[in-house]
């Protein structure tokens, strides 16, 4: 390994992704090429005996892309929400996480690099990822291990931003006081803490969440940390 910088993030980098389903395989990925930037300095890390790759190879295509969207209709979604609420009221369930898909089609190839670049620009405080066509940006951190310190960022409880700073500040305050969102958040934090506790000699679970501001929404967030045994 030849490393002339010796800074955080330089040299080979390993990324991991763990499935919520224990029967599914997890992933360990060492990228062939990493372009990094920190404190005004940029660098490139590549694996192999070949010469340094040309940066032009990684510049996203600037062609315009038109997408057509399709997905489930509002009535179906509202029905699912109503049935989930009834199950919670009856005590059958404590929490439900609903998801719906939207299909985007295009007559041109969709550049993953361009999509990643756009996500990184729009959501600078999130983790952006791409693997075998799975591309996204998430503010939630399942687990991070730094020496013996393990960290998990839990998000639960969300409100949409309006774009008006004064109005959004008031909405952030209402989110932080919402009994419904606080109960939902506590459930998620407890689930993570209970999973990490058997693996740690000590843990820190904050009593109250903070409000994480993204470009389009705000989340209740808690950073659960522990020292591995």
Label for each model-derived stretch:
Residues 28, 44, 135-136, 152:
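Generic recognition of long tandem-repeat/solenoid scaffolds
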Residues 15-16, 99, 130, 144, ...:
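Short beta-strand segments
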Residues 1-11, 90-117, 151-164:
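Short N-terminal secondary-structure initiator segments
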Residues 59-141, 183-188, 192-195, 199, ...:
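Active-site pocket-lining segments that scaffold enzyme catalytic pockets across diverse folds
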Residues 27, 32-34, 133, 140-144:
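Short, surface-exposed charged micro-motifs
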Residues 2-103, 199-201:
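Non-catalytic accessory segments adjacent to catalytic cores
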Residues 38-53, 57-60, 67-69, 144-223, ...:
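Cytosolic ligand/metal-binding cores
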């Amino acid at each position: 390994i030849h490393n002339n910088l010796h800074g955080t993030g330089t040299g080979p980098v390993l990324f991991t992704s763990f499935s919520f389903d224990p029967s599914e395989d997890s992933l360990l990925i060492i990228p062939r090429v990493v372009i990094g930037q920190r404190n005004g300095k940029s660098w490139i890390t590549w694996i192999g005996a070949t010469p340094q790759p040309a940066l032009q190879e990684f510049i996203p295509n600037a062609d315009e892309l038109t997408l057509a969207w399709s997905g489930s209709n509002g009535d179906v979604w509202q029905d699912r929400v109503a049935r989930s609420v009834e199950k919670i009221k009856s005590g059958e369930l404590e929490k439900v996480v609903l998801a719906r898909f939207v299909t985007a089609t295009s007559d041109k190839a969709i550049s993953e690099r361009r999509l990643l670049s756009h996500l990184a620009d729009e959501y600078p405080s999130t983790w952006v990822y791409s693997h075998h066509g799975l591309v996204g940006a998430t503010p939630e951190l399942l687990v991070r291990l730094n020496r013996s310190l393990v960290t998990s960022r839990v998000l639960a409880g969300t409100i949409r931003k309006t774009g008006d700073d004064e109005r959004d500040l008031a909405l952030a305050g209402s989110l932080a006081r919402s009994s419904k969102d606080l109960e939902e958040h506590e459930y998620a934090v407890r689930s993570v803490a209970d999973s990490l506790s058997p693996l740690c000699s000590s843990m820190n679970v904050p009593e109250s969440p903070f409000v994480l501001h993204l470009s389009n929404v705000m989340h209740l967030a808690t950073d659960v940390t522990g020292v591995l045994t």
